[in-house]
């Protein structure tokens, strides 16, 4: 694993606060992940977000995994907002494809955020389907089950303080196949873009929406994944993340001409 967090202070250019990490696979007792609920790292090196017993997924399971280091997503002193990119691979597999539930999501949330609600279609992120600015959550959901607040198909959605997605695209979920995802956020345009590709058949899905992170999130957040299974015994699936990388870049302030060195921030992780 490669993990870095540093400040670059260069002559006549903006300084940048950068957080970057990469998990090509996961290991047991992964110290740099905060596991919540049913999440664990399997013996195969996969981040298993929901419970599997004797090879069978369990209903009413909720699990989350967050990176332990906070992400400085915007700076109150300058008003600047970070850009970020994250890529990951995951597999969702249901014993019965027509009864998949409920899905997996990547999210940004306050540092002290814990599992909310009853799981199921609320993803452990929300207490109800109603909007509330108090959540301070932005998420990208990969939804395998249609709930009352959803479009009438499996979909990828961008969620802002509500499980009711602000924008969606139909998702042709492939049962048991590896999906590769890239999510980017460009601070200059406030554009959040999601792309998902299945290498097995080269199908791709793209979704974009304007999201003002500064008006939604606190200055410091954690990033991670959450997943749930259904609230009845027949609606189940596995929700496994195979790999994950993330980089955020926050421009901080202009440097003086006399400073042309590169300085490390207060801590670094190797």
UniProtKB/Swiss-Prot annotation:
Glycosylation, residue list: 60, 76, 127, 201
Keyword Glycoprotein in record: yes
Annotated GO MF terms: carbohydrate binding; metal ion binding
Pfam families per the UniProt record, alphabetical: Lectin_legB (PF00139)
Binding site for Mn(2+): 141, 143, 150, 155
Signal peptide: 1-15
Presence of keyword Manganese: yes
UniProt keywords, alphabetically: Calcium, Glycoprotein, Lectin, Manganese, Metal-binding, Signal
Superkingdom of the source species: Eukaryota
Family: Belongs to the leguminous lectin family.
Name this polypeptide is given: Bark lectin
Organism for this UniProt entry: Styphnolobium japonicum (Japanese pagoda tree)
Lineage: Eukaryota, Viridiplantae, Streptophyta, Embryophyta, Tracheophyta
């Amino acid at each position: 694993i490669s993990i870095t967090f540093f400040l670059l202070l260069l002559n006549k250019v903006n300084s940048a606060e950068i957080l970057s990490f990469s998990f090509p696979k996961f290991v047991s007792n992964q110290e740099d992940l905060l596991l919540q609920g049913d999440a664990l790292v399997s013996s195969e090196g996969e981040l298993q977000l929901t419970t599997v017993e004797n090879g069978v997924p369990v209903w009413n399971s909720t699990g989350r995994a967050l990176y332990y280091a906070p992400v400085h997503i915007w700076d109150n002193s300058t008003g600047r907002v970070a850009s970020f990119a994250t890529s990951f691979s995951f597999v969702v597999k249901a014993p019965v494809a027509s009864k998949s539930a409920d899905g997996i999501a990547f999210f940004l949330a306050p540092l002290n955020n814990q599992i909310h609600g009853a799981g199921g279609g609320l993803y452990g992120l929300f207490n109800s389907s109603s909007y509330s600015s108090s959540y301070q959550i932005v998420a990208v959901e990969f939804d395998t089950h249609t709930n009352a607040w959803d479009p009438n198909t499996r979909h990828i959605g961008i969620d802002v303080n509500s499980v009711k997605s602000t924008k969606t695209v139909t998702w042709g979920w492939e049962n048991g196949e590896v999906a590769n995802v890239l999510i980017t956020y460009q601070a200059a345009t406030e554009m959040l873009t999601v792309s998902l590709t299945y290498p097995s058949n080269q199908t791709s899905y793209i979704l974009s929406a304007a999201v003002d992170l500064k008006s939604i999130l606190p200055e410091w957040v954690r990033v991670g994944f959450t997943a749930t299974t259904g609230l009845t015994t027949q609606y189940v699936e596995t929700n496994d993340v195979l790999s994950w990388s993330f980089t955020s870049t926050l421009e901080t302030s202009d440097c003086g001409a006399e400073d042309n060195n590169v300085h490390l921030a207060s801590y670094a992780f190797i």
